[in-house]
Amino acid sequence: MNKTLSVMLAAGLLVCGMAGAAEKPAAAFTPEQEARIGEIAKDYLLAHPEVLVEVSQKLQAQQQEKQQQAMTAAVIQNQAALLNDKGTPSYGPADAKVTVVEFFDYQCIYCARLAPELEKVIKASPDVRFVFKEFPIFGQRWPASLSAAKTGLQIWKQKGADAYLNYHNAIYATGHNEGKLTDADISAAAKAVKFDAKTAHDVQGTLDGINTLAQQLGFSGTPALVVLPSAGASADNVTVIPGYTSAEALQQAISHAAGDTKK
């Protein structure tokens, strides 16, 4: 990058010196001067293509940082919807110091890969609350995605936290994602927790609310995770993870939200 700037500055100084010889300094480069500067820059970039890679990486990092800041600000603004929706399944103590919120789709392959990692964290963190935002983004493409999400919410309302988590884990344990999940898979997982479909609640309103919340947070894909203090969330203690992560990284985010470590 320094070499590029040197070339451009040299070109600029050259034409500025030419312009300085005139009676009045030029307000801008002439077409001929602009063409020459362009040729110099083009020749340099052709000889040093790694500069373009460096610039691209820097721009991408800047865009990701801006996106992260925007999502964090949205999380802080929408804390109540993230933490207090009684229609959303949760597991763990209601008075937990830290909450982990997951937006997921049962047919998402990266959600499936995240599931065992999250299960490890749940087992290792009995003092943390976990909130499960059913976000079936593949529902139109694969109907079982929506069906599994609705059944999960209905089990939560009818049977509570333990039954919901068992169902949730059982769906992922099938290993059936990306269109492979079947109605039989869903029925078997629901039957295992003694779910009564005849007395099921209407959960469309909850799904609509989750979809709206995801849009407000800037989440367009799954999985997406938010780790935050259950009270007093700020830009300094919130972690937003828009994608797959490991159990270790998730534990670090939990410690950060609890104030135990620096981010």
PLM region descriptions:
Residues 91-108, 115-118, 130, 134:
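Short active-site neighborhood of thiol/selenol oxidoreductases, capturing the structured segment around
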